[in-house]
Amino acid sequence: MYAQFIRNVLNDEDIVMKSAGEQYRSWCYVVDCASALLHILLKGENGVAYNIADPGSNVTIRQLAEIIADIGGRQVRMVIPDEIETKGFNVVKKSLFSLTKLKSLGWQISGDFHSKLQSTINEMKQSR
């Protein structure tokens, strides 16, 4: 949905939500993800799994849509789907990652989520 929301604003379209968007998710800017992966390669322990996310990005899908719409100068519209369409929806309400192990390696996130979304949208506009 993240990519679809950005595609909507890049195409000068409103974001259409087909649920209340109350599910919480963790997100991560690609540069931060790459930085974390390198940090894990250099300082991580072999065989240990590390979560990568931006704790400042722990927002609901609705909040994500509103932030992206605001950056793109668009609106968020709600469309109630029929029962058949909702059968494919993810029922997980909260999917937030713990960064305890990654932070114990000394990795830190830089910048804020809104600025990173703004940067992503600007880069994509310029590449069109």
What is the role of each PLM region?
Residues F113-R128:
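Amphipathic terminal alpha-helices
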Residues M1-Q4, E13, K18, V30-V31, ...:
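Glycine/proline-rich active-site loop of Rossmann-fold NAD(P)-dependent oxidoreductases
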Residues C33, L37, I52, L64, ...:
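Non-catalytic, hydrophobic alpha-helical segments
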Residues V30, R62-Q63, E85-I109:
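Conserved C-terminal active-site "lid" loop/helix of NAD(P)H-dependent oxidoreductases
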Residues A20-G21, S98:
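C-terminal lobe/hinge of AMP-binding adenylation domains
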Residues K43-K87:
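Mid/C-terminal beta-alpha module of Rossmann-like enzyme folds, strongest
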